[in-house]
Amino acid sequence: MYIAVPAEILGIILPLLLGVAFLVLAERKVMAFVQRRKGPDVVGSFGLLQPLADGLKLILKEPISPSSANFFLFRMAPVATFMLSLVAWAVVPFDYGMVLSDLNIGLLYLFAISSLGVYGIIIAGWSSISKYAFLGALRSAAQMVSYEVSIGLILITVLICVGSCNLSEIVMAQKQIWFGIPLFPVLVMFFISCLAETNRAPFDLPEAEAELVAGYNVEYSSMGFALFFLGEYANMILMSGLCTLFFLGGWLPILDLPIFKKIPGSIWFSIKVLFFLFLYIWVRAAFPRYRYDQLMGLGWKVFLPLSLARVVPVSGLLVTFQWLP
């Protein structure tokens, strides 16, 4: 029996998987440049075939499960994590009208999907029957839940400025000025919260090698490990896309000039996403890992009060000057 997959869905999934593969290569190249070494340059010209070689290596490896693990949950956890990282793209507009489903509650949809992501990690840690995997899963769950609160309050600030949860309308509201300029402190907090939400350095505490070996995926090999890996990098691209949509005008050109308007909006969107992905990699190369208590303190004692305090003056200014949408 064949399952028909619409071309629109394939048009999102295939470029995303290709982007994840070359994002890994770009990360290794940038890390090598920062550390004054060459990086991968053997497989293909300039190492361009290295992602293909890594993918084949993972596919051909034998999937090994711990003898005491819950087999069904152990196998389903990476699948759930990877699928959630894909379905979130259903409401992300790449250009005006270029979106799979232009929901009026797109913002709430994204927040709901990101909240579900923690379940795959918790199930992976619990079903592995390993203390290291379980401790990594608990850390990840606490970290993701903590920073989702700050992300929610930050998005309320954007929501107040626009008056809509539709992502296309949020982008069109930035025709005069990108929200990242008047709300620059909010943009910085949102990006740092995205680092913590995706378990990326310097907040990669769930995968701290010196403490937890490899965190919640320590018992995974072959395609199970590959799906967790793909899910993590797909979430990186998603969060970079959200930073672009909410604060850098999405597909809108940098300047309102005729020459820039000739460039397709999807190209502008991709350029801005690549900028945030470069920041992801640069932060990993430049900053040391936080201690766990510092990470949680930053989320609850700094970002939560600041993001909440930011909602009040923004809404007050909009009401005072009658700028409410």
Curated annotation (Swiss-Prot):
Keyword Phosphoprotein in annotation: no
Example GO biological process: aerobic respiration
GO CC, alphabetical: mitochondrial inner membrane; respiratory chain complex I
Superkingdom of origin: Eukaryota
Location in the cell: Mitochondrion inner membrane
InterPro entries (alphabetical): NADH_UbQ_OxRdtase_su1/FPO, NADH_UbQ_OxRdtase_su1_CS
Transmembrane segments: 5-25, 68-88, 105-125, 144-164, 177-197, 227-247, 263-283, 302-322
UniProt cross-references to NCBIfam families, sorted A to Z: PRK06076.1-2, PRK06076.1-6
HAMAP family documented for this protein: NDH1_NuoH (MF_01350)
General function of this protein: Core subunit of the mitochondrial membrane respiratory chain NADH dehydrogenase (Complex I) that is believed to belong to the minimal assembly required for catalysis. Complex I functions in the transfer of electrons from NADH to the respiratory chain. The immediate electron acceptor for the enzyme is believed to be ubiquinone.
Assembly mode: Complex I is composed of at least 49 different subunits.
This protein's name: NADH-ubiquinone oxidoreductase chain 1
Provenance organism: Arabidopsis thaliana (Mouse-ear cress)
Lineage: Eukaryota, Viridiplantae, Streptophyta, Embryophyta, Tracheophyta
